[in-house]
């Protein structure tokens, strides 16, 4: 009796192959079982949640140039809710629910505190007041505003850790905080133009960016590093996947620059914000990309 070959015989093109009885000794039939794809795990499904939230939030922002009035306000509220939820759920998947709650309470709480003091006293941003366009308020501050702090504070914390982590808390707070503050060069002109808040004394201002006093940017450069320092101390230091937060930062930087330049007619805002935010986001994206390449080697 001859032994069975190590591989099945290949049939001629277009014809099924059926082995004859006794052709392989005692083999009576040949059964081929196709490999089944691995089932999608619940962890993979959960990992898609912050991706979906962030992507939907970005889509809401992309629609801004096409909207006005109440539709624009709804899109603004929706984008902040979705992007802040993306930050919190990403932190929950990376570090656990307790850390995510710490992120939300700390960032939103400090943001609310700074804004409430600012509205009441004019310190540290200057004298300003919110309109009634962003929903319910606490202490004169719309609830949405602390969530806006949260949605960018988280990715800026990760940016600060990657770019300034070798210099301890001071390095993380300085780099991450200034990155967060640079965002306001886009944020304030947009919100003032949309009528969400107004400044009592809007001068002196940046060239080409009327309506927002320089004191506002100074206030951000005080509050944002303080917030990042507290978050750095309060949250775990374990490395996390950074693609979703990095994508949010990249979109905020490039999308805001493009929107102000092309759609909103604010070229100076595009210039100031694009340069300032690019000083932090561009090196961060480059460093993150290099790190991912090194990990694959």
Q: For each predicted feature, which ranges?
A:
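Aromatic-rich, lipid-facing transmembrane alpha helices and their immediate juxtamembrane interface loops
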Residues: 2-297
């Amino acid at each position: 009796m001859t032994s069975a070959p190590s591989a099945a015989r290949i049939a001629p093109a277009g014809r099924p192959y059926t082995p004859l009885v006794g052709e392989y000794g005692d083999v009576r039939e040949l059964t081929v079982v196709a490999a089944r794809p691995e089932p999608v795990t619940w962890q993979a499904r959960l990992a898609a949640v912050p991706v979906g939230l962030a992507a939907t939030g970005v889509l809401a922002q992309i629609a801004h140039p096409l909207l006005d009035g109440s539709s624009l306000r709804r899109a603004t509220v929706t984008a902040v809710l979705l992007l802040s939820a993306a930050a919190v759920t990403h932190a929950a998947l990376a570090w656990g629910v307790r850390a995510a709650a710490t992120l939300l309470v700390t960032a939103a709480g400090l943001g609310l505190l700074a804004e409430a003091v600012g509205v009441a006293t004019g310190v540290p941003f200057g004298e300003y007041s919110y309109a009634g366009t962003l929903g319910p308020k606490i202490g004169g501050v719309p609830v949405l505003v602390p969530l806006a702090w949260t949605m960018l504070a988280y990715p800026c914390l990760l940016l600060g850790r990657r770019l300034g982590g070798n210099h301890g808390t001071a390095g993380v707070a300085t780099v991450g905080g200034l990155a967060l503050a640079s965002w306001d060069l886009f944020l304030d002109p947009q919100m003032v133009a949309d009528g969400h808040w107004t400044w009592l004394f809007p001068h002196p201002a940046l060239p080409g960016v009327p309506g927002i006093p320089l004191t506002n940017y100074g206030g951000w450069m005080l509050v944002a590093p303080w917030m990042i320092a507290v978050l750095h101390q309060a949250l775990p230091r374990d490395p996390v996947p950074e693609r979703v937060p990095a994508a949010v930062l990249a979109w905020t930087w490039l999308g805001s620059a493009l929107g102000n330049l092309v759609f909103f007619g604010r070229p100076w805002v595009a210039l100031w914000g694009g340069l300032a935010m690019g000083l932090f986001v561009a090196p961060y994206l480059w460093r993150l990309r290099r790190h991912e390449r090194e990990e694959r080697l």
